[in-house]
């Protein structure tokens, strides 16, 4: 492979039933970085023979103890930036290696409180509804319905990371909304 001594540096892991299909399937989610020595070219990206961090998010549908379907997302722009290739214009947020949750408690290998999961899902759906409905008079008012004032946004390369509601609006939401008309979630 392209990476020598490859490690999976997992920051988030959880599983649960999928709302999109009426809670009829179980999916497992994992996020973090693959870390290794970038020693050989990878899909046209030249190797630099240095440590590299490849951000990933993967989702697996599990049936009868086996993986039946997988979706894998990797931040190729981040890998390209690590070798000095910048194929898109300057991002509005900061380019960083994204850490896991602040309290380092994102690895949920055991069963969790069902009510807490339902409450979290309701909050996520409310946030998506707020974005789709456009019912608030300002971006600040919209975001404060669901987000903490000192929220962190760990956007992919090309967008970048930002911190606090005000900077999120300035560095991500405003540029994204003015450049992407007609967006919808689920």
Task: Show the residue positions of the predicted features.
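C-terminal and inter-domain tail/linker signature
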Residues: 1-186
């Amino acid at each position: 492979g392209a990476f020598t001594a490859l490690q999976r540096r997992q920051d988030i892991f959880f599983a649960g039933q999928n709302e999109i299909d009426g809670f009829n399937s179980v999916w497992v989610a994992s996020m973090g970085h693959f870390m290794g020595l970038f020693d050989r070219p990878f899909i046209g990206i030249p190797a630099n023979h240095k440590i590299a961090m490849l951000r990933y998010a993967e989702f697996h549908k599990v049936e009868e103890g086996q993986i039946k379907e997988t979706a894998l997302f990797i931040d190729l722009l981040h890998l390209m930036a690590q070798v000095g290739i910048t194929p898109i214009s300057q991002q509005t947020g900061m380019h960083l290696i994204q850490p896991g949750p602040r309290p380092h408690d994102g690895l949920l290998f055991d069963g969790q409180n069902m009510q807490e999961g339902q409450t979290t899902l309701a909050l996520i759906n409310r946030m998506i509804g707020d974005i789709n409905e456009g019912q608030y008079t300002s971006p600040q008012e919209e975001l404060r319905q669901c987000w903490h004032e000192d929220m962190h946004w760990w956007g992919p390369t090309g967008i970048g990371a930002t911190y606090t509601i005000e900077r999120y609006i300035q560095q991500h939401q405003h540029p994204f909304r003015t450049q992407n008309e007609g967006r919808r979630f689920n």
